[in-house]
Amino acid sequence: MENDTVSEMNQTELQPQAAVALEYQVVTILLVVIICGLGIVGNIMVVLVVMRTKHMRTPTNCYLVSLAVADLMVLVAAGLPNITDSIYGSWVYGYVGCLCITYLQYLGINASSCSITAFTIERYIAICHPIKAQFLCTFSRAKKIIIFVWAFTSIYCMLWFFLLDLNISTYKNAVVVSCGYKISRNYYSPIYLMDFGVFYVVPMILATVLYGFIARILFLNPIPSDPKENSKMWKNDSIHQNKNLNLNATNRCFNSTVSSRKQVTKMLAVVVILFALLWMPYRTLVVVNSFLSSPFQENWFLLFCRICIYLNSAINPVIYNLMSQKFRAAFRKLCNCKQKPTEKAANYSVALNYSVIKESDRFSTELEDITVTDTYVSTTKVSFDDTCLASEN
């Protein structure tokens, strides 16, 4: 979501210092290389998996690709330059690099924030308004929204081209070059505060409210409430399965439903909580420094704040993608990992409006893959292996 802080932090690091402790340099380089390296690989895999696998091109995955690209920008533009900063103690990318790298930092963070907001709204519509979702949550609409998100953030972040410049400080034994600002802190502080509100506070409030509605649906609506829908699903089940249902299997299915829905809700809570916590130190620092005459610039705390941001960008593939069976299978296929032969994949998946729809339908989302045992069990359906499955062969 944001890097208003990242740019300021890079400037903070480059403030005149007699020397940077060797242990600080080593820790910085080690952490940045590991976290950013793994994050870059993970986000690239997300993009490749969705682009190369036809059945993965869903509206939800479209937002995940946008988020992965934004996280790549954050990791590359905001993370990797810290290595050269730690080694040389000075800005080595020149004036053009100062403009472009800072621009990409802000673009990646703000686009990440907007992508998460768009994804949150899409999840809310898909789960809480499944009828509307069939024409609102489409692949073509998702692409248009993403184009708008990137166009908006690209234009918005251009203001930094007019605020940045190289600052040169001369000392006895060295000349330190920093990527800084042309204007006083009193002028750019309002910009940071605006970014804090637009790209952090508002998305977090919106996510909290919408995920609250999602949790209410998942917890308080364990079975379909429409008798006609129940009757229709029962008739469809009777064609393909035994008419005599076992009560024990029904209980197992119900327990599986409750457990699955709790798991989904936990995942949604983790998404919100991690995003809020990992961005909070950096955002809080920016807000506090905006009101201080002399900004707080302790190196180790600044490093902690940056590492939190890099972790947020690196961990997103784990949170959003590795909880999906389809993504795991696509990852293994991409890595050419050998898999045991399995039964043919089901041709149908269960939507959260308790109706069965084809996977090729435009309203196909990844959350349904996560909750494959979550919605259809209310009809006491028994699969061929005596477990609760939400698909038909």
Curated annotation (Swiss-Prot):
Q: Which Pfam families match?
A: 7tm_1
Read off the CDD domains from this record. Answer: 7tmA_TRH-R
Provide the residues annotated with a glycan attachment (glycosylation).
N3, N10
Listed under GO cellular component are: plasma membrane
Q: How does it sit in the membrane?
A: Multi-pass membrane protein
- Location of this chain's protein in the cell: Cell membrane
Q: Does the keyword Cell division apply?
A: no
Which residues point to the Extracellular side? 1-28, 84-99, 169-193, 289-296
Q: What is its main location?
A: membrane
| Family under the similarity heading | Belongs to the G-protein coupled receptor 1 family.
Provide the protein name: Thyrotropin-releasing hormone receptor
